Amino acid sequence: GCCHLLACRFGCSPCCW
């Protein structure tokens, strides 16, 4: 994972998907 859980929700996708 290159992003934090919160970051994923703010538009850090598709990092955490």
Curated annotation (Swiss-Prot):
Alphabetically ordered keywords of this record: Disulfide bond, Neurotoxin, Secreted, Toxin
GO terms for MF: toxin activity
SS bond partners: 2-16, 3-12, 8-15
Location in the cell: Secreted
Any one GO cellular component localisation term in the record: extracellular region
This protein's record includes keyword Secreted: yes
Chief site of localization: secreted
Tissue specificity of this protein: Expressed by the venom duct.
Similarity comment text for this entry: Belongs to the conotoxin M superfamily.
Role summary: May act as a neurotoxin. Has no activity on mollusks (tested on the freshwater snail C.retropictus).
Domain notes: The cysteine framework is III (CC-C-C-CC).
Protein name as annotated: Conotoxin Pn3a
